[in-house]
A protein has these predicted regions:
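RNA pseudouridine synthases
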Residues: 1-224
């Protein structure tokens, strides 16, 4: 666990693809509990430590995750994420070049709970939620393409699903059509940055997570 930002109200970590944000059926220790122990030790606190979850990242995804250190920050950040006042930028490595190097994707997503998978459609249908993102090709190698994604809505598996529908499955994402897994078990989707107005100080905050320690990531991001 790597802490990449901290103030009196907020703490952010660079999540690896092996870590989970909140507890799940695996029983693995979540980042929220790791942070409580980290804060308790750092500040020598004898009692309980408050750490609130403000948003989530899928387990196989890496990058910025923001937690609240106070209840005031938690309630305000939860609302900011809900109404889209946190600008989230992702980087994704995909196997195919998009037909256009820059564009907007607008789809209707239907979530299948049993499969833990979402399906994208061109038109509205029952139980579908509108999903919007903008993407831009920012680098490429002989075999892979690095896309920067500005996420406008936060739907279940949205980026993974929409990029796959576009014909550009994310490297390592077997669930959405890539042909083989990554060695670390994750997928090549990275929450690169989060930018927002601080819920208490009202100053502009931008938190950036370094790319994963991987040769392909480093090669593609060297000029970014």
């Amino acid at each position: 666990m790597e802490v990449i930002y901290e103030d009196n109200h907020i703490i952010a970590v660079d999540k690896t693809c092996r870590e989970i944000v909140q507890g799940d059926k695996t029983g693995d220790k979540p980042l929220s509990e790791m942070l409580k122990a980290w804060l308790k030790e750092k500040y020598c606190k004898p009692g309980n430590v408050f750490v609130g979850v403000t948003h989530r990242l899928d387990r196989p995804v890496s990058g910025v995750v923001i937690f609240a250190k106070t209840s005031k920050a938690l309630s305000r950040l939860n609302e900011m994420f809900r109404v889209g006042e946190v600008r989230k930028t992702y980087w994704a490595i995909v196997k195919n070049r998009p037909q256009q190097d820059e564009g907007e994707l607008v789809d209707w997503l239907v979530r299948n709970e049993k499969q833990n998978k979402s399906y994208a459609y061109d038109t509205e249908r029952p139980n579908a939620k509108r999903a919007i993102l903008r993407y831009k090709l920012i680098a490429h190698s002989d075999n892979y393409y690095l896309l920067e994604i500005d996420l406008k809505t936060g739907r279940h598996h949205q980026i993974r699903c929409q990029l796959a529908k576009m014909g550009c499955p994310i490297k390592g994402d077997l669930k959405y059509g890539f042909d083989r897994s990554n060695k670390d078990g994750g997928i090549s989707l990275h929450a690169r940055s989060a930018e927002f107005i601080h819920p208490v100080s009202k100053e502009n905050v931008r938190i950036v997570a370094p790319v994963p320690d991987d040769n392909l990531w480093k090669a593609l991001s060297v000029d970014q």
